[in-house]
From Swiss-Prot:
A GO cellular component annotation in the UniProt record: endopeptidase Clp complex
Catalysis performed (reactions): Hydrolysis of proteins to small peptides in the presence of ATP and magnesium. alpha-casein is the usual test substrate. In the absence of ATP, only oligopeptides shorter than five residues are hydrolyzed (such as succinyl-Leu-Tyr-|-NHMec, and Leu-Tyr-Leu-|-Tyr-Trp, in which cleavage of the -Tyr-|-Leu- and -Tyr-|-Trp bonds also occurs)
Name of protein: ATP-dependent Clp protease proteolytic subunit
Keywords, ordered alphabetically: Cytoplasm, Hydrolase, Protease, Serine protease
Subunit structure: Fourteen ClpP subunits assemble into 2 heptameric rings which stack back to back to give a disk-like structure with a central cavity, resembling the structure of eukaryotic proteasomes.
GO MF, one annotated term: ATP-dependent peptidase activity
Gene symbol of the encoding locus: clpP
Disulfide bonds: none
CDD domains according to UniProt: S14_ClpP_2 (cd07017)
Organism field: Streptococcus salivarius
InterPro entries: ClpP, ClpP/crotonase-like_dom_sf, ClpP/TepA, ClpP_His_AS, ClpP_Ser_AS
GO biological process, alphabetically ordered: protein quality control for misfolded or incompletely synthesized proteins
Function description: Cleaves peptides in various proteins in a process that requires ATP hydrolysis. Has a chymotrypsin-like activity. Plays a major role in the degradation of misfolded proteins.
Localisation: Cytoplasm
Active site, per annotation: S96 (nucleophile), H121
């Protein structure tokens, strides 16, 4: 069930679902697994807010275990494409593809709540259902390219050498807010009274 907010306006009462009300304040909630439908919704909101006023920041709250690489990269590319600065605020967790999205916020405007967590690791993949050796080889090569691409993005976003990111992402690597700050994925640990 999605909560509804009722506001008094000059014309009487207006009711909004909570996400529409937050969107009026340029707040987007990226929660749950990253998949195509969710990514399309996030992208549409980013484009709408940028078209509405590209001089104002957009606030992207992130709480995700990660998910689809292609869906996540579509969000990242849109964040980089629009003119509005995108503040990212990690609450709960940003794991896997979520770290790529959250760390791609505008530098200087990437935040994390004190008890949130970050997790980087190498991408997972399969053979795409093919059982032929050539299909498996193609899938393995694609997975390596994907890993290199994601590690380059994480290196660029954190300021760490790609070799360090490669080693650190070999297995699930969980980080506290302080460790995430020291790594360079965020710019500040946000106190609860700083939230928009």
């Amino acid at each position: 069930m999605i909560p509804v907010v009722i506001e008094q306006t000059s014309r009487g009462e207006a009711s909004y679902d909570i996400y529409s009300r937050l969107l009026k304040d340029r707040i987007i909630m990226l929660t749950g697994p990253v998949e195509d439908n969710m990514a399309n919704s996030i992208i549409a909101q980013l484009l709408f807010l940028d078209a509405q006023d590209n001089t104002k920041d957009i606030y992207l709250y992130v709480n995700t275990p990660g998910g689809s690489v292609s869906a996540g990269l579509a969000i990242v590319d849109t964040m980089n494409f629009i003119k509005s600065d995108v503040q990212t605020i990690v609450m709960g967790m940003a794991a896997s593809m979520g770290t790529v999205i959250a760390s791609s916020g505008t530098k200087g405007k990437r935040f994390m709540l004190p008890n949130a967590e970050y997790m980087i690791h190498q991408p997972m993949g399969g053979t795409g259902g093919g059982t032929q050796q050539t299909d498996m080889a193609i899938a393995a090569e694609h997975l390596l390219k994907t890993r290199n691409n994601l590690e380059q993005i994480l290196a660029d976003n954190s300021g760490q050498p790609i070799e360090k990111v490669h080693v650190d992402a070999e297995r699930d690597n969980w980080m506290s807010a302080q460790e995430t700050l020291e790594y360079g994925f965020i710019d500040e640990i946000m106190a609860n009274n700083q939230l928009k």
